[in-house]
């Protein structure tokens, strides 16, 4: 019998909250998550920090509504907050936000090459944050794995490093589904030598102080906490630059 660590129990509990909230929000609907209302969640705007001196680092943040900044004002998204923290740490980083609300891994796969080809240059790193809508719609883990694999294969072909911000399915979706889904991200991270943050909403989901009213998306304070955890990992995942001659 597999021994479930306290950390894994905590992540399962958090994932359960996410799915329960998402299913309530999506009850009797099959359409994509709607566009945010004009009045977004109140909260502190991510401060705009000028790019520091040093070599430019281009990062693509490719994901769903958690990257897109659903329900937040412009400049309050997770990629915005990570960019700010990187610049505060002395990294001349620019993050292109390619988050689209409602995207499943299949929808992301369809637009992935287009997103890469329309960047100003080859990115130094690609963050991929998909899977939440796959869980909410209970898409088969094999399909999710195939879509994620295709995107990572594309990055491998282009010699672009990846970082995965993972998603987890809760136990109430069934032991087989949960097992097959939750192993996708660590498996792929190991196979493609990608940096892995196992569950993007860890430490945020379930805390009403950090979540919007829908209980699915973080508010600005939740974004700040996520970025605080992710930014050092993103910095470490950036490839080492060759010394200038």
Language-model segments: residues:
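Bacterial signal peptide processing site
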Residues: 27-31
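Cys/His-rich zinc-coordinating "finger/knuckle" motifs
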Residues: 34
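Sec-dependent bacterial lipoprotein signal peptides
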Residues: 1-25
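Subtilisin-like peptidase catalytic core
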Residues: 99-108, 131
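Conserved Rossmann-like nucleotide-binding pocket used by diverse enzymes
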Residues: 23, 96, 163
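Alpha-helical cap/lid subdomain in secreted, periplasmic
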Residues: 6, 91, 110-245
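Serine-esterase "nucleophile elbow" of acetyl-processing enzymes
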Residues: 37-101, 113-122
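Generic structural signal for helix capping and beta-alpha/helix-loop junctions
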Residues: 69, 103-105, 172, 206
């Amino acid at each position: 019998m597999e021994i479930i660590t306290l950390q894994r129990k905590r992540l399962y509990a958090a994932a359960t909250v996410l799915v329960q909230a998402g299913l309530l929000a999506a009850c009797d609907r099959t359409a994509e998550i709607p566009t945010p209302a004009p009045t977004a969640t109140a909260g502190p705007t991510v401060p705009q920090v000028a790019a520091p001196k040093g070599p430019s680092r281009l990062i693509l943040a490719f994901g769903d509504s958690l990257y897109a900044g659903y329900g937040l004002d412009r400049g309050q998204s997770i990629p915005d907050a990570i960019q700010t923290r990187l610049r505060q740490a002395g990294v001349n980083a620019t993050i292109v936000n390619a988050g689209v609300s409602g995207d499943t891994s299949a929808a992301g796969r369809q637009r992935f090459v287009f997103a890469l080809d329309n960047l100003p240059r080859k990115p130094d790193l690609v963050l991929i944050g998909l899977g939440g809508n796959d869980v909410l719609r209970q898409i088969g883990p094999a399909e999710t794995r195939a879509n994620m694999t295709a995107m990572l294969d594309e990055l491998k072909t282009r010699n672009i490093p990846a970082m995965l911000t993972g998603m987890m399915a809760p136990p109430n979706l069934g032991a087989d589904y949960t097992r097959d889904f939750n192993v996708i991200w660590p498996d792929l991270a190991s196979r493609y030598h990608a940096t892995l943050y196992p569950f993007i909403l860890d430490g945020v989901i379930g805390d009403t102080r950090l979540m919007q009213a829908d209980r699915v998306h973080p508010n600005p304070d939740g974004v700040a906490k996520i970025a605080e955890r992710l930014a050092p990992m993103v910095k470490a995942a950036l490839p080492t630059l060759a010394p200038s001659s």
